Amino acid sequence: MANRTIIAFDFGTKSIGVAIGQEVTGTARALTAFKAQDGTPDWQQVEKLLKEWQPNLVVVGLPLNMDGTEQPLTARARRFANRLHGRFGVQVALQDERLSTVEARANLFDRGGYRALDKGSVDAASAVIILESWFDEQAG
């Protein structure tokens, strides 16, 4: 297994959560959440993050319905992933993110109650779950 640095994004129309992880350990941690205007982040913030961490791969959560079908947000997340690749030349993978927000909220609540459930924390924690599920899939 390679020792690649990987950044994950939990795409949303108002906020985009970010996590970072190492493939060799299969672990991830929350980094931040960016505000977004109708799904568009401040691309300068994204560029700064990518320059700082220099990931070998970017994983973008793909929002699907529970039955696995696509929803309107699915196409927007794909577009966001394509823009990351087009603007910054990074390799991008998509990862099913069903229930990541539910799991993130439960984990944060367990650690800090309602006060821990601010939008940025939830989105960054969701990005961690997306990245960890990607690691799990790669491990087989």
Swiss-Prot record:
PANTHER family: POLYNUCLEOTIDYL TRANSFERASE, RIBONUCLEASE H-LIKE SUPERFAMILY PROTEIN. Keywords: Cytoplasm, Hydrolase, Nuclease, Ribosome biogenesis. Could be a nuclease involved in processing of the 5'-end of pre-16S rRNA. It is an enzyme of class 3 (hydrolase). Its main location: cytoplasm. GO terms for molecular function: nuclease activity. HAMAP family: Nuclease_YqgF (MF_00651). Its EC number is 3.1.-.-. Belongs to the YqgF nuclease family. GO terms for cellular component: cytoplasm. This is Putative pre-16S rRNA nuclease. It comes from the Bacteria. SMART domains: YqgFc. The gene is yqgF. InterPro entries: RNaseH-like_sf (IPR012337), YqgF (IPR005227), YqgF/RNaseH-like_dom (IPR006641), YqgF/RNaseH-like_dom_sf (IPR037027). It is found in: Cytoplasm. GO terms for biological process: rRNA 5'-end processing.
